[in-house]
């Protein structure tokens, strides 16, 4: 049996593509464009795992398909290479993070090239390259000039073990850090913030303009979380102080019986009475040790302390005790709430715990038993009595505005973006702080502000980054003799990834971020493929920066990514015991088709789980490529199931894909190829071209491969294969298995040219219809012959053909024909005597 040798074929074609720059981005202005983007990887020390190529293969198939359809294709790759792991490694080993990063990139690139992806490597970007981050810094200076980058003293999520503050989005629900799982504490620090809130409405509205999964749009909507309501001002009794509360339900103001301030609220110390001072100070200290997520957990026990003061309810003059409680966040809304315990579960639990008044203002429910959180007509509400929710809200807002104690207000849960990190391995923030108290941005002519090379990259211990230790870089003097210090915080890893798709368009431009005409030509990105875990952060940040650049006239589109697709997760094979605990694969043995624990002998259940080092079920693509070939890996990952489904890795599935490719190889290299078309494969070939074309366009790669298999099965039943169909089939399979595609193309054409730009095959609509039908001929009710005849023959023609058939003539010889019944396209029934 003939098998193809992937170890010879694949490196040969990879070298051919590299030497000939086969995938250099097309620039023919008369052609349509297609920009296929992968989420670029962080080059970790572990290298690629088999999950990476799933998305990369999908965009590669699309890119190869679009090239063959006559598009200019931009399909680039680069490296999101700043970040904590490299710095952590450098601190652990004493090595330079830049060297570690360069080694990792070289390894990733080797692995990616071994998989046959058609990237234009002339456009490679690396976020740690000063020629790249010059423009990351330039964008920051523009944000600063527009007032969108500002410094603030804010309570941050401080991680002592990492020596840095992290964004809210990087804190896990259990209150630990996403990276490392370390404790997170709240600590006030001077930080750089980006005013993403200024774009909240546009970030919300423009989701309507993009073709993204609805689930991802919903995650962004929920993160931005727009609320319409009212601001209400409460005076503090016996003082000149007041505070503002934002509420979405101003209609329930008559039911507000107490107020709660965040422990960090600026008013707390000023209104706390001497009797309560110690308890309040103690509570504030405890709250500072908790993350926002831990504080707002609905299931946790309610805690709080009374300040000793009262606020006055503006609508009825009632006194409301003012408490502090950690479930109110200083960073959300105004950092103060009015509590309506009759109609809010959290307020109700708090009121019950601390014996506070509960006054119902909506009809329905028993508020002694539980909060009534549904809608009802208003009661105990003076001028709102008898009104429904919408009417009551409108009337209360009107009253608040007339009395000068409130106004209608739209708010968003979205917070400004905490942009500074107290780390070394990141882009320096291009700001200088002068001793006269002013700050200025580093002028564009002095960018990039290069990260200095230093051995001393441990956290400074002061809360500043290690750059505070590099004095010759840190200290500067102006022409007028005024001394200054450079900003020591660096940018987060999100910075470089918020605009990299723009740099691919013009990666070597030294004068500007990218040429306007090229940006006009290529934007927006046509398809962006990556994991759903980036749904909120990266995608929201990139959209924000893109909108700022749109306002600056740098980019021509409002949105960066027209279509987004999230590939599913490739799960590892794993095993569970009777308690449901996962067992590492090296502790499992297979006997008679069942799986057993090596040490205990217990029978185990096979169950897919996320690949992890601890379960020893991580599959390295290098091993797969070596054993089966890159084309097999590509075809297998696309054939596993729908691209957006999470599916378990299977060695059997891999073997099946390899066998299919061997059959393809044998079909083209051993079957007699003829210039004459017998017509036997007309229908299946044209069906295959039509189906594969449509399914690749819709990213239904698994069904496209299934159709290719249908063609191979049909072709194998024939003695010969029509040359045009052989070539067309090889073109169809080439985007999936590009090395094999090139090899078979040369076997058929000996052209010496790559298959990559050969025009995509078209199909003949008329051949999709069956022109012939099989009919049965019955004599005395028994089938005596089956005939293939032209479709839609008339009764008379059908009768003629049937009676002329040799088998039929033998049956009716010497007999009298009483009647012939012909049913077009079905049967002929002959009655004889």
From Swiss-Prot:
Short motif ('HIGH' region): ranges: 41-52
Protein's GO biological process: leucyl-tRNA aminoacylation
Subcellular location: Cytoplasm
GO molecular function terms attached to this record: aminoacyl-tRNA deacylase activity; ATP binding; leucine-tRNA ligase activity
Predominant subcellular localization, coarse grouping: cytoplasm
Pfam families: Anticodon_1, tRNA-synt_1, tRNA-synt_1_2, tRNA-synt_1g
GO cellular component terms given for this protein: cytosol
Major enzyme class: ligase
EC number(s) recorded for this UniProt protein: 6.1.1.4
NCBIfam families: leuS_bact
Name of the protein in question: Leucine--tRNA ligase
Name of the coding gene: leuS
């Amino acid at each position: 049996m003939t098998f193809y040798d992937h170890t010879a074929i694949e490196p040969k074609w990879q070298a051919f593509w590299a030497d000939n720059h086969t995938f250099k981005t097309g620039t023919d202005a008369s052609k349509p464009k297609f920009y296929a983007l992968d989420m670029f990887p962080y080059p970790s020390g572990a290298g690629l795992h088999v999950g990476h190529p799933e998305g990369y293969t999908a965009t590669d198939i699309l890119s190869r398909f679009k090239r063959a359809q006559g598009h200019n294709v931009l399909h680039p790759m680069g490296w999101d290479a700043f970040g904590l792991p490299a710095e952590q490694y450098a601190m652990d080993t004493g090595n330079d993070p830049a060297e570690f990063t360069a080694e990792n990139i070289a390894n990733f690139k080797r692995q990616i090239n071994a998989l046959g992806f058609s990237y234009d490597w002339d456009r490679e970007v690396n976020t740690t390259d000063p020629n790249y981050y010059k423009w990351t810094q330039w964008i920051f200076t523009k944000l600063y000039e527009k007032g969108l980058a500002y410094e603030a003293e804010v309570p941050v999520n401080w991680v002592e073990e990492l020596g840095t503050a992290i964004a809210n989005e990087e804190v896990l629900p259990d209150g630990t850090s996403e990276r490392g799982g370390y404790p997170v504490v709240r600590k006030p620090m001077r930080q750089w913030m980006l005013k993403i809130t200024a774009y909240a409405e546009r970030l919300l509205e423009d989701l309507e303009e993009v073709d993204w999964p609805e689930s991802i749009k919903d995650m962004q909507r929920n993160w931005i979380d727009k609320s319409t309501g009212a601001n209400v001002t409460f005076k503090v009794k016996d003082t000149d102080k007041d505070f503002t509360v934002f509420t979405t339900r101003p209609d329930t103001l008559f039911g507000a019986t107490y107020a709660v301030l965040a422990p960090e609220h600026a008013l707390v110390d000023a209104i706390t009475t001497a009797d309560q001072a110690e308890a309040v100070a103690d509570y504030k200290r405890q709250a500072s040790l908790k993350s926002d997520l831990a504080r707002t957990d609905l299931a946790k026990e309610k805690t709080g302390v009374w300040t000793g003061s009262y606020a006055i309810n503006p609508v009825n003059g009632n006194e409301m005790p003012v408490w502090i409680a950690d479930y109110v966040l200083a960073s959300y809304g105004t950092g103060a709430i009015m509590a309506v315990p009759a109609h809010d579960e959290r307020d109700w639990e708090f009121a019950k715990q601390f014996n506070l008044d509960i006054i119902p203002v909506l009809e329905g429910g028993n508020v002694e038993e539980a909060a009534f959180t549904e809608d009802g007509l208003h009661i105990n509400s003076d001028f709102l009595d008898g009104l429904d929710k919408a009417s009551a809200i409108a009337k209360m807002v009107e009253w608040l505005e007339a009395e000068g104690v409130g106004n209608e207000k739209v708010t968003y849960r979205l917070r400004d973006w905490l942009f500074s990190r107290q780390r070394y391995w990141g882009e320096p923030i291009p700001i200088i702080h002068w001793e006269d108290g002013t700050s200025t941005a580093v002028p564009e002519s002095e960018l990039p502000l290069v990260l200095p090379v230093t051995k001393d990259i441990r956290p400074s211990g002061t809360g500043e980054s290690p750059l505070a230790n590099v004095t010759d870089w840190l200290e500067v003097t102006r022409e007028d003799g005024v001394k200054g210090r450079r900003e020591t915080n660096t940018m987060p890893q999100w910075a470089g990834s918020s605009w990299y798709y723009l740099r691919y368009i013009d990666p070597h431009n030294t004068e500007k971020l990218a040429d306007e005409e090229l940006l006009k030509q290529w934007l927006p990105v046509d398809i962006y493929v990556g994991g759903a875990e980036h749904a909120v952060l990266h995608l929201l940040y990139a959209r924000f920066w893109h909108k700022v650049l749109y306002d600056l006239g740098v980019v021509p589109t409002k949105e960066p990514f027209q279509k987004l697709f999230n590939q599913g997760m490739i799960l590892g094979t794993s095993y569970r015991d009777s308690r449901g605990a996962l067992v590492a694969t090296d502790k499992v043995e297979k006997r008679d088709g069942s799986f057993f624990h090596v040490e205990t002998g217990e029978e185990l259940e096979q169950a897919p789980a996320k690949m992890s080092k601890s379960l020893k079920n991580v599959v390295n693509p290098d091993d797969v490529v070596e054993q089966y070939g890159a084309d097999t890996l590509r075809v297998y990952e696309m054939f596993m199931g729908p691209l957006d489904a999470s599916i378990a890795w299977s060695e059997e599935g891999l073997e099946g894909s390899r066998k299919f490719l061997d059959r393809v190889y044998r079909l083209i290299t051993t079957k007699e190829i003829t210039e004459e078309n017998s017509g036997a494969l007309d229908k299946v070939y044209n069906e295959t071209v039509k189906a594969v074309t449509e399914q690749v366009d819709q990213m239904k790669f698994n069904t496209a491969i299934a159709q290719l298999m249908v063609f191979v099965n049909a072709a194998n039943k024939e003695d010969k294969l029509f040359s045009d169909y052989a070539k067309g089939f090889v073109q169809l399979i080439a985007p999936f298995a590009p090395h094999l595609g090139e090899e078979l193309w040369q076997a058929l054409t000996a052209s010496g040219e790559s298959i990559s730009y050969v025009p995509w095959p078209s199909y003949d609509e008329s051949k999709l219809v069956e022109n012939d039908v099989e009919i049965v001929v019955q004599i005395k009710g028994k089938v005596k012959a089956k005939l293939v005849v032209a479709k839609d023959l008339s009764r008379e023609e059908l009768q003629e053909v049937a009676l002329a058939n040799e088998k039929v003539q033998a049956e009716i010889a010497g007999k009298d024909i009483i009647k012939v019944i012909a049913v077009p396209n079905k049967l002929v029934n002959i009655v004889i005597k």
